[in-house]
Amino acid sequence: QFFMEEAFFDDCGSYVNNQPIDYHIQAIEDTEIIYFYLDDLKAIAEKSSVIERIGIKIAADFLNNHREHVTILMKFSPEERYKYLLTNKPELVQRISVTHLAQFLDISRETLSRMRARLAEQNIL
């Protein structure tokens, strides 16, 4: 997944299970990272219902984005996936390298390049 400015990232499973995440996070642009220790975060949430609600909202947003990505991969052809991003997340298409975009769409870089060329010829881009 990709996260833009002022976005929060979390791993609900690691939070709930009190275990480290089992993948890595890579910043592809200059990034400022603020992290919280789990015990500190739980203590703050217990003292503030506002913080607790913010945490729930962050988790819900993350789960919705993940669900959307999985649904797109399962339901759409590679071209439909790319068109979906063009329509619904144009900032990703504009800012992310072809290599990262292809990985996100679960297609090869070459396939994405050919698809983009074909769509450009059809004036769809």
What are these regions (language model features)?
Residues F9, I34, K42:
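Nucleotide phosphate-binding site architecture
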Residues D11-C12, A43-I44, L85, M115:
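Residues that scaffold the ATP/ADP-binding catalytic core of kinase and kinase-like folds
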Residues Q1, Q26, I34, I56, ...:
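Residues that recognize and position ribonucleotide moieties
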Residues Q1-Q26:
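Cyclic nucleotide-binding regulatory domains
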Residues A7-F8, D40, T111:
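Short, well-ordered alpha-helical scaffold segment located
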Residues F76-L125:
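Phosphate-/nucleic-acid-contacting segments
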Residues F3-M4, I28, F36-Y37, E46:
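A conserved hydrophobic position in a structured secondary element of the catalytic/binding core
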Residues I21, D39-S77, R81:
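A small-molecule sensor/coupling module
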